[in-house]
Amino acid sequence: MGTFDDLTKKRNVVVTTYKRDGSAVATPVNVVVLGDHAYFRTWSTAGKAKRLRRDSRVAIAPSTARGKPTGPAIAATARLLRPDEVPVPREALAKKYPILQGKLVPLAHRLRHYDTVHYELSASEPTGPPN
C-alpha cells in the first residue's frame, strides 16, 4: 500500500478524481496528513465533490500550486467526513495553512454560502481509472 509520509511537509498536492466516462480530472488542493490519512476540504457543489459522490477512487501526488505533479501518485480512497469528525482535520488544516485555510477559505465559503465538506483519504492498492 501507498503512504502519505512524503506529503506531510508538501504545501501543494493534486487530487485526481474520475468522471463517469473514466477520464481523469486533476485538481490542486491543500492537504494535511494525520497518521495514516490525508485530509482536504472543498465545497459540496464543487466538481471534485460531485465526482467523489459517484466514485471514491482518487490518486494524490505532490504538485505545484497550479496542479502540475512533481512526484509519483498514490492510489487512495476518499471518504466524506461526518460533521462530528470535522474539527480535528479542520484545525490541522488551519494550523498548516494559517492564512489560506485558517482565514481565507472559511471566509470565502461563508460569503458565498457554500456548504464546506471535508474528505479523508486512505491509501489503497492501485486499481486504475474506472471503466
Report each predicted region and the residues it spans.
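Basic/polar N-terminal segments that are highly enriched at the extreme N-terminus
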Residues: 1-2, 127-131
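Generic intrinsically disordered, low-complexity segments enriched for polar/acidic and small residues
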Residues: 1, 15, 36-37, 94, ...
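A generic short-segment signal for beta-strand/edge and adjacent turn/coil regions
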Residues: 1-2, 7-10, 27-31, 42-49, ...
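Short, structured beta-strand-loop surface elements
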Residues: 45-118, 122-125
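Residues at structural and domain junctions
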Residues: 1, 7-8, 38, 75, ...
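Short helix-to-loop capping/linker segments positioned immediately adjacent to catalytic or ligand/cofactor-binding
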Residues: 2, 15-22, 104-109
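Extreme N-terminal tail/first-helix region
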Residues: 1-14, 68-70, 103
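Short beta-strand segments
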Residues: 10-44, 52, 58-62, 71-74
